[in-house]
Swiss-Prot record:
Protein name in UniProt: Cell division inhibitor SulA
Described purpose of this protein according to its UniProt entry: Component of the SOS system and an inhibitor of cell division. Accumulation of SulA causes rapid cessation of cell division and the appearance of long, non-septate filaments. In the presence of GTP, binds a polymerization-competent form of FtsZ in a 1:1 ratio, thus inhibiting FtsZ polymerization and therefore preventing it from participating in the assembly of the Z ring. This mechanism prevents the premature segregation of damaged DNA to daughter cells during cell division.
Pfam families attached to this UniProt entry: SulA
Protein keywords: Cell cycle, Cell division, DNA damage, Septation, SOS response
Subunit structure: Interacts with FtsZ.
InterPro entries named among the record's database cross-references: Cell_div_suppressor_SulA, P-loop_NTPase, SulA_CellDiv_inhibitor, SulA_enterobact
The organism's taxonomic lineage, starting at the top: Bacteria, Pseudomonadati, Pseudomonadota, Gammaproteobacteria, Enterobacterales
PTM characteristics: Is rapidly cleaved and degraded by the Lon protease once DNA damage is repaired.
Record PANTHER family: BLR3025 PROTEIN-RELATED (PTHR35369), CELL DIVISION INHIBITOR SULA (PTHR35369:SF4)
SUPFAM superfamilies: P-loop containing nucleoside triphosphate hydrolases
UniProt family annotation: Belongs to the SulA family.
Span list, region Lon protease binding: 162-169
Length: 169
């Protein structure tokens, strides 16, 4: 999995350890927008990284919103992944311009612990700022999922960011 230079930008999160501590209780989660760039031929890697966080957020009383481009989440997958079926909402077949605006509106409401949206293009600074402000207002997390093909990943050089955690060193 590749993490873009915009990943994990938030004015309220100063350290990885602090982020994990804040996620652990319901009303102390600060707004966060993170971009996850992953290879389309290796979706399991992304699931392994995000599922524990989504499971933890599923313990909150708020919803989880998935804004998917075409695919419909299967009930079986949601249940087998350990996510609360009664708290997962999905809206599919949104165009990219509607996905961004829908994410901003949903994050702002405070009704969702997490909003996950798929976008093919990188966010502009202004778009990221709008998302971050909405996440702060709604005390929610937003994940921008950006798939790349295996071919594009092999032929293109990424100036990425490696995230090291002092929890594991």
């Amino acid at each position: 999995m590749y993490t873009s230079g915009y990943a994990n930008r938030s004015s309220l999160f100063s350290s990885t350890a602090g982020s994990i501590a804040r996620v652990s209780s319901e009303n102390t989660t600060a707004g966060l927008i993170s971009e996850v760039v992953y290879r389309e031929d290796q979706p399991m890697m992304t699931q392994l990284l995000l599922l524990p966080l989504l499971q933890q957020l599923g313990q909150q009383s708020r919803w989880q919103l998935w804004l998917t481009p075409q695919q419909k989440l299967s009930r079986e997958w949601v249940q087998s992944a350990g996510l609360p079926l009664t708290k997962v909402m999905q809206i599919s077949q949104l165009s990219p311009c509607h996905t961004l605006e829908s994410m901003i509106r949903a994050l702002r409401t405070g009704n969702y612990s997490v909003v996950i949206g798929w976008l093919a293009d990188e966010l502009s600074e202004e778009e990221h700022t709008r998302l971050a402000q909405a996440a702060d207002e709604g005390n929610a997390m937003g994940f921008i999922m950006r798939p790349v093909s295996a071919h594009a990943h092999a032929t293109r050089h990424h100036s990425g960011l490696k995230i090291h955690s002092n929890l594991y060193h």
